[in-house]
Amino acid sequence: MPLSPTISDVLDVKYPGPPAWSADGDFLAATTYEDDGNSLFVTDPAGDSPWKFVPEEGHVTEFAWSTTTPELLVATDAGELFLADPDERTTDLIRSGPEATASYTWSNDGTRFSFYRDGRPVVRDATTGAERSFDVPERGPFLDEERMFAWSDDALLAYRFVEDDTTHVGVIDVNSASGDTDELVWRTRGEMASSCPAWLADGRVVFDRRGEGGRVRRTIAADTETGEESVLVREIDRERGIVSSGAPTVSPDGTKIALSLPMDGWDHVHVVDAETEERTQLTEGLFEDKGVADATPRWLDDETLVFASNRNDPGQRHLFSVSIDCETTPLVETPGTNVHPRPAPDGETLAYVHADRTRSPELRVSSVADGEPRTRRLTRSSVEEWPTPPVEPERVEFESAGRCIDGYLLDPRQSDAVDDATDLPAVVCVHGGPMRQMRDGWHPSRAYGLFYTYHQYLAAKGYACLFVNYRGGIGYGREFRQAIAGSRGKDEIEDVARAGEYLKSLDYVDADSVAVWGLSYGGYATLQVLGTHPDVFSVGINLAGLADMELYRGWAEETKYPAAVSAEALRMGGEPWEVPERWDEASPATHMANYEVPLYNFHGTGDRYVNFEQLDVVVEALTDLEKEFDADHYPGENHVFSKRATWRRTFRKVERVLEDER
């Protein structure tokens, strides 16, 4: 047996997604990423009868529990839709076809469900299978928001569509006579982007509205009969931009909404009475009540919310409840990261994802009723089966431009790989986003959890590994998130460079062998720092990073999000024609003539988050400059590569690169 984890061990780690309960609370389900895609994991709350559904073709893309029965829809990337019965452990194929479908959402009475087919809203009868497609504005090219459909109790269906290059919310009367001209009962208009519809008890539709280049956010309640709109929440920051995220959630009785807002400089739980429009901040303090970047508080009942918070430790997350009277109660304080809290229908049990220093993400449930809390592990981390325990991270701090920056260090001397060596190689890992945060242990998401797992492999090979939480990330307050506004590509890159210098200062690190790498914004930071701080790192590795900011901006505002919500100009300090020098300075391609060390690149051609043409920019520029580089492209691969074989090849090559550059 090997004395340290292998690449296969790294790739065997599974990543459960956010859990969801059946309507009766007898089952909960979550997708689990393994090998090349998601399977579906379903279990009872006691964990006595787990069931895994793996489709014969393709992988699970989404699932949706019926609102009335313990059945769920399961969609795959092979174009199939199943109705699954976890009690009988059966799956019935109810539709298939080459058309693109997505966003399955059950009606409140459980008799039908909506979805997009080739961009058009479709409603299907759950019993007869009869379908009706509505000839209304289409879904459009932009990425999904948290809610794409929302059903009212009287058969009105709200949905998101795209028109005039921005997102809108419209309402369909699904009971209108078949054959009539399909017209929207109500819709939003204007240049601002509207999304994430939900319904209030008084019949109004509530939704998120953003605009003015990321400077304005409002939560709107609209009367679909009169068109009258009320602003329930208003955020405006014309200098540095809005950095709040997460869709508002409606209370079970439909009279209140809750969301996480940084009104006092830190993300906290807020509730708004939909009738009086009175907003109440329920939590406060110099910490953030948010588990992951797009998280939002969840209703336990009409008077209580549950949420994740780093109030106990900036790099961890624990679960709490808060009443509308502002009384906060700890629910789960297990050391590590506890996120995605989902209360059971009876309010007595909480499902969530847990990860820590010794365990990769697991699905867990804890009792939240009065009495001694009990926790059950519904899935178990395969890290427990490794031949040696993982290296536990150490929180470290260093100064960057007068600011304290922190990160998490894996010291390989904790393992059996090395003893008191004084010439160990080192790696700085840069997360994406930038509104993300590396944690005190495994990250709950696959993207960063996989990187953390691989660095455990590197640490066992004798590499010192540092995860840097640079300016622009979450977990440290609004000012920290807004710190790169107007100076993108400068201040946060200084933080990355200082992380490299910190590693060089360690007496057991070889100062001539410190690498830097990252995915997405981490890839961008790698490309940028090699040109702006060419003497810090010995090699760079870029996965799906940005090289030309103006090229990216044009592509992103056509395919990812509307220009109304795009904060690219704000982050640059102006439009390209206003401050061309800033756009040039923020683009790594501008600085590639300064490269002094080799660069290795990996990118998938099917990337929906960073355009593949960015790799073309890198290759063309470095070829013309006669710089040392290498570039791999993976046909059809995603932003975070989906295939096990792709990651195996990438990780093996990264290891060879690090060894060769020592």
Regions found by a protein language model. Give the residues of each.
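Beta-strand-rich domains and repeat architectures in extracellular enzymes and scaffolds
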Residues: 7-41
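Active-site-proximal cap/loop segments of hydrolase catalytic domains
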Residues: 451-454, 467-662
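Structural motif
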Residues: 36-41, 79-82, 119-123, 165-170, ...
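Non-catalytic accessory segments flanking enzyme active sites
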Residues: 16-20, 158-161, 167-168, 195-196, ...
